[in-house]
Amino acid sequence: MTQEEQIRLYRLMEKLNWFFHQEMHYLDRETAEKTARECYPEIRNFTYDILWNDLPKEVQEQFTDEEESL
């Protein structure tokens, strides 16, 4: 992971921590929708591209096998 990606991930985690830290944030529909719209593209990118590509092949295969058994 590049330093730029690490910074992006840190900022994403900060935003998610802010959101989940106070129950009033996720109980407020407008705040929840805004946070979801802002965060989901980064979550998807990190999950399926950045972090996935950093995993060793054997770990990727393990996750793939687990998904197939669901």
Model-flagged regions — what are they?
Residues 10, 14-17, 37, 41-45:
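Generic structural signal for well-ordered, non-transmembrane alpha-helical segments
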Residues 1-4, 54-70:
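Short intrinsically disordered terminal tails
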Residues 1-30:
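N-terminal acidic leader/helix
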Residues 28, 35-36, 43, 47, ...:
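Long, low-complexity or tandemly repetitive, helically biased scaffold regions used
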Residues 18-21, 25, 48-56:
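Charged/polar positions within long, soluble alpha-helices
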